[in-house]
Amino acid sequence: MRFAYENADTYLRWKAGTYVDLQGDAADELDDRIDEFHDWHRKNALPKYVRLAREAALRFDDGLSRPDLDWGYDALRGQARESVRKAAELAAPMLDRLTPAQVAQIERRLQDDNRQFQRDYLRGNERDRRRKRAKFVTDRLEDWVGKLSQAQMEQVREYAERMPLLDEWRERDRKRLQGEVLAVIRARQARERLPELIANWERGRDPAYARALQSWRDQYFQLLVDIDRSLSPEQRRRAHGNLRRYAEDFEALAAR
């Protein structure tokens, strides 16, 4: 993690360049704004990550409950809002100066992203997509606790089979937000409107999708509580060690 964080500014410069071509003073300004965001994040966000990781480890030691998962979800979403708002504030003045050709370049890249989303999440029949969902959840859990038992894998499989597929809704919601952002940029109103729009990405979401997401979250959190109850001592030690290492990494990065 430390290596990735220390090189995040380089990645952001490369990523931004895949959306819009900036030259000369504009490219220099982008570099300065990325550096400013990275410095802000190190100073303001990382210390909060340290506290969150330590609190999560304490809660995990006592056994996960639904309130614990709600706390973690709300805390992470709050941190995401702060970061994307700051990023939008820094990017907005540059976005307001883009030419129509540059805005069109961003739109084309978003269309490419949407085609990739379709390949990643909408390809295949329902059975294939549910199998892919089960593998994704299994892989993420094993990142934290190590190899799952057969009983735990069966719990994941049952969850993947039971829950509705939301990817079509996700695709529509992505396009909704993209359209709103592009409209703000075209109107040259990024400074006035973009930070609030980005930080509240769920506003304007289809109410049916919002309800489906809440149902998914309820079922997923129940799966996590059930898996937690079945963890072996070794699995629990591994997960606790991961949380502790995250806290140590965040603390070391914040101190630089």
Spans of features found by a protein language model:
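Extended, structured, electrostatic nucleic-acid-contact surfaces
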Residues: 1-19, 77-80, 84, 88-92, ...
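N-terminal Sec/ER secretory leader and immediately downstream segment
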Residues: 2-101, 105, 109, 243-246
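Extended, non-membrane alpha-helical segments enriched in charged/polar residues
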Residues: 35, 96, 146, 222-225, ...
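Alpha-helical rod/repeat scaffolding segments in eukaryotic adaptors/tethers
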Residues: 62, 66-69, 123, 127-130, ...
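Extended amphipathic alpha-helical interaction segments
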Residues: 89-204
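A short hydrophobic/aromatic micro-motif that marks alpha-helical segments and, especially, helix-coil
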Residues: 37-41, 114-117, 164-167, 247-250
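Histidine/glycine-enriched, metal-chelating micro-motifs
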Residues: 23, 99, 149, 232-233
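A cross-kingdom marker for long, charged
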Residues: 4, 13-14, 171-256
